[in-house]
Structures are given as structure tokens and as C-alpha cells.
């Protein structure tokens, strides 16, 4: 499985997931008004969001 780890004007960066990690995730955490910290990567299970964030998971490549 290959997951996107970052997006920018220059394109995307990806990561090959380790054995047992079969989910890609994207997590947004609110840092301030209209300001979010976004992290992406591989996971064995979908992580849970905290009270200031949101998580989206998928099990497909990129």
C-alpha cells in the first residue's frame, strides 16, 4: 500500500506502508482561526480524532 504523506505546489510525496499497516490516514488539527495542522501517513487502524481535529481514512493507494 502506498499512502500520500504530503502535497505541495511541486507535487505529492508518498510512503510505502510497512507490513500490517493497511490504512492511509489524513488528520486535521485546528490550530487557530482558519489554520490547521495536517498530517498524513500509514496506520494499522484508523486513528481517532481529538476534540479539535478530524480524521479521514482509506484503504486504497494514494
Curated annotation (Swiss-Prot):
GO terms for cellular component: extracellular region. Keywords: Disulfide bond, Secreted, Toxin. It is found in: Secreted. Disulfide bonds join 3-24, 17-42, 46-57. It comes from the Eukaryota. InterPro entries: Snake_3FTx, Snake_toxin-like_sf, Snake_toxin_con_site, Toxin_cobra-type. GO terms for molecular function: toxin activity. Expressed by the venom gland. Belongs to the three-finger toxin family. Short-chain subfamily. Aminergic toxin sub-subfamily. Heterodimer of C8S2 chain 1 (AC P01410) and chain 2; disulfide-linked. This protein shows a synergetic toxic effect in that it enhances the toxicity of other toxins. This is Synergistic-type venom protein C8S2, chain 2. It comes from Dendroaspis angusticeps.
Amino acid at each position: 500500500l502506498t499512502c500520500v504523506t504530503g502535497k505541495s505546489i511541486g507535487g505529492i510525496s508518498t510512503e510505502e506502508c510497512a507490513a500490517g499497516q493497511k490504512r492511509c490516514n489524513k488528520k486535521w488539527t485546528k490550530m487557530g482561526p482558519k489554520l490547521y495542522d495536517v498530517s498524513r501517513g500509514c496506520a494499522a487502524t484508523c486513528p481517532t480524532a481529538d476534540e479539535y481535529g478530524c480524521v479521514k481514512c482509506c484503504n486504497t493507494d494514494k
